[in-house]
Amino acid sequence: GSDSEGSTGVELNYGPVASLQITVGLPIAFARDRDGMTWGAGDVAASAKFRFYHDDKLGLSLAAFPGLTLSTATRDLGAGRVTGFLPVWIQKDSGKWSVFGGGGYAINPGTSNRDYWTGGIAVSREVSERLLIGLEADRSGADTIDGNGSTSLGIGTIYRMKIPFRLLASGGPAFEDGGGPAGFHFFTALGLDL
């Protein structure tokens, strides 16, 4: 089999005041290679999104969303150091359609590592009161000195179940610069709104 890695866990989002969202990610990470499967705690991520511009009439919002990933992983399942991300996001809503995206600078210290730019864009449409679908494209620079940048494409959905639950899913191909076989990314989550 091929090598793979990923994580599962809990992401907590809290809005203590209007225009501010605090996010903490508490992952359980895994990695699989020819020697078998390894599980353990992943790196904890913490960020704060501050919406500094919002216009209901135009349906336009701008936000900064800086974050840190703390070196809390066990069993070599994390970065091994604190990393940071300094992005800016924009969103435009028009009826049942939304276009959103942005990007920023990733701070990735460490031997053979490098800082890099990353960003993406998505378009979504509310198909019904319960179902939203969308398409996304993301681009990331190389995160190591000898590494390659990558591009991923995806289709996603949010299905609003009975209150307070939402089911989120997305997936699609990923392409590394320099060729080679395409990879695949997949995300699924159960949202709970309290």
What kind of feature is each model-predicted range?
Residues 1-194:
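Transmembrane beta-barrel domains of Gram-negative outer membranes and organellar outer membranes
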